[in-house]
């Protein structure tokens, strides 16, 4: 294997926009039912001590001619709070693994066998902050696996509505739609005592063609 700088390896990790200040649901004009579902989901996720998820990630690219092209990247992630994370994304434009053990953060590219490791904070939440603020990296699903997920999702929110229910991958889900300055986002949250997210769609409002992720 070949070691190299983490910031160089991180070029294929999706970058996040600058995070503005949080606002309350009332200030943002969020419907009470939408807020209740979001709070229920984030409380459920933050209360899980250990879990694994498999997702199908989609990245939409808009060409100079205005054509939208979609790329997919299946991803798996295992979290053990407070300080363990293993995540992998493999697809058309990314082949990457991320390891965090409470002491260090490592990115590894299986295809090129390049890796990079840096010291990391002792908790997952703190590592996610450092990865973004100092390295410009965002772990898969960072908005949802942070124990402060509600606060992260509510950053710069302008409105939120409850759109009813829909079936996603065989699961009956609550459908939420939120708007912020730079993005619109939708969540489909499973009904019942285990309100896990079944689908999460982000639409950019600042990029030409409004691509979705």
Predicted features, each with a name:
Residues 10-20:
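Bacterial N-terminal signal peptides
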Residues 21-27:
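Boundary at the C-terminal end of the N-terminal hydrophobic targeting segment
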Residues 1-11:
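Bacterial N-terminal signal peptides that target proteins for export
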Residues 29-32, 56, 106-107, 116, ...:
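Gly/Pro-enriched, hydrophobic low-complexity segments
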Residues 107-145:
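Acidic/charged, solvent-exposed loop-and-adjacent secondary-structure segments enriched in E/D, K/R, S/T
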Residues 147-153:
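Edge strands and adjacent loops of beta-rich recognition modules
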Residues 29-114, 161:
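N-terminal mature ectodomain segment of secretory-pathway/periplasmic proteins
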Residues 64, 96-100, 109, 117-119, ...:
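A short, polar/proline- and glycine-enriched secondary-structure boundary/capping micro-motif
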